[in-house]
Amino acid sequence: MKAILLAGGLGTRMREETEFRPKPMVEVGGRPVLWHIMKNLSHFGISEFIVATGYKSDMIKDYFLNYEARNNDFTIELGRQESLVFHDAHDEAHWSVTVAHTGEATMTGGRVHRAARYLDGQPFLVAYGDGLADVDIDALRESHERAQTLVTVTTVQ
């Protein structure tokens, strides 16, 4: 199962935090809230993520493009192409992250529609990229499959 994470909104209610970065990149414990959501989903076996970006998309792209260098020791031979070697492994090494710019003003349904081309016909879940909730994804998936429905919506208080 893949996860589409909606990470393109303006975050107007958190203006002091989101004036300079998108809301999913606001840090909690030294990591972006988006990372915490992905980490939580990975505990349920979800390791393929499509991050549907918009507002300040470049910051999310830069975060994942530079993820290995930020989280590992490495050796680089300057002046040689393809000479970068990372020395440490981390729990996220098996994650696959697709960052898809889905438009600056695109609404939720439009973001899902634009990200759908990366799903390859697989079942998927959609989650907001700026809020972490205590949801038992295994139980949710089981309930969804048992009901044989097209869509299951989960809300939390």
Identify the residue ranges that each predicted region occupies.
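N-terminal glycine-rich phosphate-binding loop and ensuing alpha1 helix
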Residues: 1-67, 99
